[in-house]
Amino acid sequence: MRASDEHLEQALKEYNDKISALEVNGTDDELLEALVNRSTILMLLGSYTASMTDAEEAIELSKGMKDVDIGTFVKMYENRGQMIFDDNEEMMVSDYSMIISRLDEIHGEIRHYDWKGLIMMCQGCAEDLIDCDRFEMSVPFTQKALELMKDASDIWSMNRKMEIQNLIGQADTGMGLDNNAIDAYSESILIGEQLYDTSRIEDPIQLVFAYVYRGDIMEAEHEVEKMWNDHESALVILEELNNRNRLSDPDLLIKLHQSLASSMMESGEIERAEKHLMRAINLGVPGMKDAIDEMNSMR
C-alpha cells in the first residue's frame, strides 16, 4: 500500500470513529462537516458507493439546517455531482446549480478549497456541463474562475486561463455565439503562444485545440484562408511534438493534413495541397497515392 493510501486509510478510521460519536451527541454542523470529509476521503480511495452515501446523507442533513458553511456546501454538492455524472446527468446538473446559487459568496479561499482548489473546482464543473451540452450553465463557473485569477500572472494561472478560454469558446460555439467564441479562442492563443514560446506551457494540445476550433469557425463562415492559417499553425505544434516523441496519438496530426489537402485541392491550391498529402503519405496513411493521382490530374 502506498504511503498516501495508508494516510487516507488512517484518516478514514478516525472519521468512522468521529462520526459514530457525533451521531450520538454532536451538533448538526459537526456531523455535516465530518460526513463531507469522509465522503471526500472515500472518493480518493475509490470507494464511490460509500462516498456517495455520505454525500447524500450530508445533503439531506443540510436541508434542515438554517446556515451551512459555504465551503462545506460547495464540497458536498461537488462530490456528488462528480460521482453521479455518468449515471444521472440531471442530478449532476441539479447539484452544480446548487453550487452556482452560492458562487457570488466566494471571493477567496473557503473551507475545503484553497485558491487553486477553487479554480480547479470551477474548471471541472464547467467541463462537465459542457460535456453534456449545458453550455449556459457553464458560464458562471468560467466567469468565477477568471474573476479569481484576475490579477494573477504566474505560470500556473496563465495555463489555467488558456484552458478556461477554450472552455468559454466551446460554450459560446454551443450557444451559437461564434463571434464570442472567436474572441475566446483568440485570447487562448495569445496566452498559449506566450507560454509555448517560453517552454512554460503545460499542455500544448490546448493551444492546438484553440487553433483548430477557431479555424473550424472560420471555415463555417467561408473564411477559408484564415482556416488554413489556423490549422497550419496547429500542425506546426503537432509536428514539433511528434518530432520530440511527445505526441501519443498522431490521429489529429494526420487528419489535419488530410483535411487541409482536401480543402486546398477544392480551392485549386494544388501545390499547397501536395505538401500536406506528401506528409500524410510519410505518416503512413493508406489511400494517399490515389489522392496524389487525383491531384496530378488537376494540374
Language-model-detected regions and their locations in the chain:
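Residue-level detector of the short coil/turn that links helix A to helix B
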Residues: 6, 46, 87-88, 133, ...
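Amphipathic alpha-helical segments of tetratricopeptide repeats
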Residues: 19-20, 59-63, 98-108, 146-153, ...
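Residue register of alpha-helical TPR repeats
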Residues: 33, 72-75, 113-120, 159-163, ...
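Structural signature of alpha-solenoid helical repeat scaffolds
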Residues: 26, 66-68, 110-113, 153-156, ...
